[in-house]
């Protein structure tokens, strides 16, 4: 192993640097674990949820790969530390052998025999069996340590290509799955785009038509309400006029009745006066005169009441006529409002039909988009 030169201190320093790098990487992965494994959905729809789950799955796979890399890194650092310790022990054994040789050589040249230490070693087989045995044991131990280090280093380096290939395969699989899902999602979006565009255009046209119908319906309803108010006002005015007409008719009837009663009283008085005139200044004549005069007074009162009733009737008739005219006007306005309402309903009906059709197309587009999102999620899961 003369071609191999190892400095244990530098190997231990490199192991410590690698451990520090691993600590920094572990802290970085731990800090990124929360935002990358639990990605918050941008919205509450199915597509946003599926996209968030895709990126969350990528984050979890990255954490799994990080854990595997951390385990390999720790094992590699431990192997470096073990190798440095083994080389240090081997160098110590070599130094001990050199010291023994340096001490025993002068003793052999001066005394002709080994030093006391070598004599003790030769006389005590249980302690090592002599200098040659000790050096041979140290050499064998150093060879075994070097071989152990080489084996451990080879065993540590051997999994690197396969681990790198496995990591590349996992990354390629993740990228391929993401590309396939993205391609399917893009295809689904392209397929759903015409439906969505068509549905959006139909929605706009239908909304404009429906808004036109609503705009026409609003003044029609206002006209109906106003006509209803005018109709109620005219009805109230007509009812008031009819009430006054009824009251005037009652007064007129009372006046006619009083006139008839007064005429009867006057006729009775005149009859009595005529019958009493035969006997002028007779007691019967004297009694008949007040009766005849009372009938004339009652007749005058009845005539006055009759005139008042006719006056009241003449005052009420214009109100009745105005109420009937207002009632006719209100009826015409009400009929016009009903016609406007029917026209607005007819204009709004096609808009509502188009709106329903656009809603169906939009629902179909959403269905296509949902199917595409489910397919993308299925590919990611598989």
Curated annotation (Swiss-Prot):
One of its GO terms (cellular component) is plasma membrane. It comes from the Bacteria. Disulfide bonds: none annotated. It is a multi-pass membrane protein. The keyword Ribonucleoprotein does not apply. Keywords: Cell membrane, Membrane, Transmembrane, Transmembrane helix. Belongs to the mycobacterial PE family. This is Uncharacterized PE family protein PE23. It comes from Mycobacterium bovis (strain ATCC BAA-935 / AF2122/97).
